[in-house]
C-alpha cells in the first residue's frame, strides 16, 4: 500500500512513494516506471496490529536531495540523496518517551509508541535547517537533521496534543 508521495521540486519527473510496510519507491519518469529503493532498515521498536508505514514525506526547500519521512509507529527517517539511502531519525524520540508526559501505548507493546507515531512532517523555506514532526504526543522540531528533537509543548494550549497534520 502506498501512503505518501513527494515530487522533486527541481524535476517533477522524479517522485518518491512511501509505502507500508516501510518501503520507498522512486520514479524518474513521472510514474511510468518505479524502482524499489534500498530498504531504510528502520528498527522495529513497537509491535502492533499493523505494519509501520510512510505517512508523509517532505523535501528540504534549500537542499532538495534531503527528504524526511514521518513513519507511523516507527518515528522518522531522512535521506540526503533523494531516496538512495536512509537514516533513522528516531533514537531521540525514543529517549524522549522516557518522560512520563510523553508516554503513550494504544496498539503496541511499547510506551514509546506515541512518540514514534509519526503522522506528518514539514519544512519551511524560511528556516530550511528545521524539520517539524507531528506525532501523537504533539509537535517536535529538529534543527540537526533529526538527531535530536525539541518538544514544541502544545500542552500549553490544549490538554490534547494528538498531532495529525502540520504544514
How does the language model describe each region?
Residues 1-167:
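Extracellular glycan-interacting surfaces
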Amino acid at each position: 500500500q502506498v501512503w505518501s508521495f513527494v515530487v522533486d521540486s527541481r524535476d517533477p519527473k522524479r517522485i518518491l512513494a512511501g509505502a507500508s510496510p516501510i518501503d520507498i519507491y522512486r520514479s524518474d519518469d513521472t510514474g511510468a516506471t518505479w524502482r524499489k529503493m534500498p530498504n531504510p532498515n528502520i528498527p522495529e521498536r513497537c509491535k502492533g496490529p499493523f505494519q509501520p508505514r510512510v505517512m508523509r514525506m517532505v523535501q528540504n526547500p534549500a537542499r532538495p536531495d534531503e527528504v524526511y519521512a514521518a513513519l507511523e509507529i516507527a518515528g522518522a527517517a531522512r535521506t540526503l540523496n533523494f531516496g538512495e539511502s536512509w537514516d533513522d531519525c528516531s533514537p531521540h524520540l525514543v529517549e524522549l518517551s522516557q518522560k512520563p508526559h510523553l508516554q503513550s501505548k494504544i496498539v503496541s507493546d511499547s510506551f514509546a509508541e506515541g512518540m514514534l507515531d509519526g503522522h506528518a512532517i514539514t519544512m519551511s523555506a524560511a528556516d530550511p535547517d528545521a524539520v517539524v514532526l507531528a506525532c501523537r504526543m504533539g509537535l517536535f522540531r529538529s534543527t540537526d537533521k533529526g538527531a535530536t528533537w525539541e518538544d514544541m509543548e502544545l500542552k500549553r494550549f490544549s490538554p490534547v496534543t494528538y498531532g495529525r497534520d502540520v504544514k
